[in-house]
Amino acid sequence: MTIKVIEGDFKASTGKYALLVSRWNSFVVEHLKDGAIDTLRRHGISDENIEVIYAPGAFEFPLAAQKLADAKRYDAIIALGAVIRGGTPHFDYVAGECTKGLAQVSLNAGLPITFGVLTVDSIEQAIERSGTKAGNKGAEAASTALEMVSLISKI
């Protein structure tokens, strides 16, 4: 008897993708957005099937993602932002609520929401993860979205 294996691939050249993008820390987040769009295009997703939705910040992502999911127009939501630690507990609240909220929306809606939200200790770490030394986490979030759309279609 053979064990059946189900896995996603990156051949999802159809589907509609919402990029939920934070305006806060735009000097980093715009690079994440560019990396995500480039990845989607390289995998055959046309510009007509990519929509960019700007929210003020990562704390606002769960509600915006819920509204996007409720619209039932998207195969996946790619959340892109940067929460940079400062000297107060604000970072912990924003990063934690963003993460929990997006996960809850994803589970409730049965919709892939990929997490391209940087949660970093410094501006340097954010810059490294938005296209320099540590790659582009926006591109990685887009790849994950493609794979999840494919996987869900096979389950």
From Swiss-Prot:
Which InterPro entries does the protein's record reference? LS, LS/RS, LS/RS_sf
Q: In which pathway does it act?
A: Cofactor biosynthesis; riboflavin biosynthesis; riboflavin from 2-hydroxy-3-oxobutyl phosphate and 5-amino-6-(D-ribitylamino)uracil: step 1/2
Q: Which domain of life is it from?
A: Bacteria
Gene Ontology molecular function terms on file: 6,7-dimethyl-8-ribityllumazine synthase activity
Enzyme class, UniProt record, top EC level: transferase
Name the Enzyme Commission number(s) assigned to this protein: 2.5.1.78
For the keyword Transport, the answer is: no
A Pfam family (short name) is DMRL_synthase
Subunit structure, interactors included: Forms an icosahedral capsid composed of 60 subunits, arranged as a dodecamer of pentamers.
The Swiss-Prot or TrEMBL record describes its family as follows: Belongs to the DMRL synthase family.
**Function noted in UniProt:** Catalyzes the formation of 6,7-dimethyl-8-ribityllumazine by condensation of 5-amino-6-(D-ribitylamino)uracil with 3,4-dihydroxy-2-butanone 4-phosphate. This is the penultimate step in the biosynthesis of riboflavin.
Q: HAMAP family per the record?
A: Lumazine_synth (MF_00178)
Q: What is this protein called?
A: 6,7-dimethyl-8-ribityllumazine synthase
